[in-house]
């Protein structure tokens, strides 16, 4: 059997896909999740495997976390638990800090104490994007705009990991994600526009486009399919990079154009209403992926057209458990 991985936030959208891959590749996987946003249905099929365990624990609870480190003695920590909402971080920065900074520090301290080998951290390429112009891409050493407490907490987390990796001697990889989408992404909370738009289309409801006056097609984003994100995580598990890397496609698209692709795939002409921008939103976020490609050869394989087609096919599955995915499907 491969090494032991403590996968924190492993019942969530991205984490559950990583959990499946790790189990398949014969790692000993311990998913830690408080299920505040993660769903047990995302991982329950993994219970049939001997190399899988689930523990319901809040990362802010140091004592309970330490019991897990003592019990399982993980060699690798993969951290995907977070308060992910930009608007919520503005409304309640103390809560954002308690999860994204205090919770992370609990994991870091225990990682040092129990002498883990490597630490993978899911950061945000979108929230930490530099101030880029049309046609430009944000690189890892750009000065982040830090337009929300969420962005600040993620950036702070990156700095803590780099510092304590040197103090404690573990390797690390910081993955700055573009806008990730794919199966199991929930429509409530900070889920991104694709599942929100898709759910509205399937329910026959109009969608809303938040746009700046000088950007009538909405903000510019970089969308990455979840299977490509899983591959990046597997690289970090097998060979930590000891740096921060962008995980995106490097291809920009407006939010309105994303909606038009959904209209085409789902064969609908439902309207979209325009309103003003949301507080804390970055106007343009497109990630340069040259660094990660040069370091380890990672490149995305799924473009936005194929990714949305895959989503459509996924949600047409007659065996889909709607309760697990928290989305109303009418196909």
Question: What spans do the regions from the language model cover?
Answer:
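N-terminal Rossmann-like NAD(P)+-binding domain of SDR-like oxidoreductases, especially those catalyzing
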Residues: 1-180, 298, 302, 309-310, ...
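Active-site phosphate/pyrophosphate- and oxyanion-stabilizing loops and adjacent acidic/basic residues
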Residues: 44, 66, 162, 195, ...
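Residue-level recognition of oxygen-bearing side chains
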Residues: 64, 85, 95, 102, ...
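Short, charged helix-to-loop "capping" segments that act as catalytic/coupling loops
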Residues: 70-74, 129-136, 187-191, 205-226
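The catalytic Tyr-centered alpha-helix of NAD(P)H-dependent dehydrogenases
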Residues: 142, 146-153, 177, 186, ...
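Hydrophobic alpha-helix immediately C-terminal to the catalytic Tyr-X-X-X-Lys motif of short-chain
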Residues: 156, 160, 164, 193, ...
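C-terminal substrate-binding subdomain of Rossmann-fold SDR/epimerase-dehydratase oxidoreductases
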Residues: 202-331
């Amino acid at each position: 059997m491969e090494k032991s991985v403590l996968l924190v936030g492993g019942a969530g959208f991205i984490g559950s896909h990583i959990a499946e891959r790790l189990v398949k590749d014969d790692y000993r996987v311990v998913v830690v999740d408080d299920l505040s946003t993660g769903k047990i249905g995302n991982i329950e099929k993994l219970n049939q495997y001997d190399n899988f365990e689930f523990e319901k624990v809040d990362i802010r609870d140091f004592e309970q976390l330490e019991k897990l480190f003592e019990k399982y003695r993980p060699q690798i920590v993969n951290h995907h638990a977070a308060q992910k909402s930009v608007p919520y971080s503005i409304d309640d920065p103390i809560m954002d800090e308690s999860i994204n900074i205090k919770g992370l520090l609990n994991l870091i301290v225990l990682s040092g104490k129990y002498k883990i080998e490597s630490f993978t951290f899911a950061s945000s390429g979108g929230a930490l994007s530099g101030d880029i112009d049309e046609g430009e891409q944000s690189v890892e050493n750009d000065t982040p705009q830090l337009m929300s407490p969420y962005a600040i907490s993620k950036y702070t987390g990156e700095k803590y990991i780099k510092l304590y990796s040197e103090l404690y001697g573990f390797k690390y990889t910081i993955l700055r994600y573009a806008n990730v989408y794919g199966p199991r992404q929930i429509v409530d909370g900070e889920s991104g526009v694709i599942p929100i738009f898709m759910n509205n289309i399937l329910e026959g409801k109009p969608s809303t486009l938040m746009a700046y006056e000088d950007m009538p097609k909405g903000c510019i984003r970089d969308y990455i399919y979840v299977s490509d994100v899983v591959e990046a995580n597997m690289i970090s598990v097998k060979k930590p990079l000891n740096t921060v890397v962008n995980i995106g496609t490097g291809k920009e698209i407006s939010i309105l154009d994303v909606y038009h692709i959904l209209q085409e795939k789902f064969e609908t002409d439902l309207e979209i209403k325009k309103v003003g921008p949301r507080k804390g939103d970055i106007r343009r976020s497109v990630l340069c992926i040259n660094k990660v490609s040069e370091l380890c050869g990672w490149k995305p394989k799924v473009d936005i057209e194929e990714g949305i087609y895959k989503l459509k096919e996924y949600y047409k599955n007659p065996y889909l458990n709607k309760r697990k995915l928290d989305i109303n499907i009418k196909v």
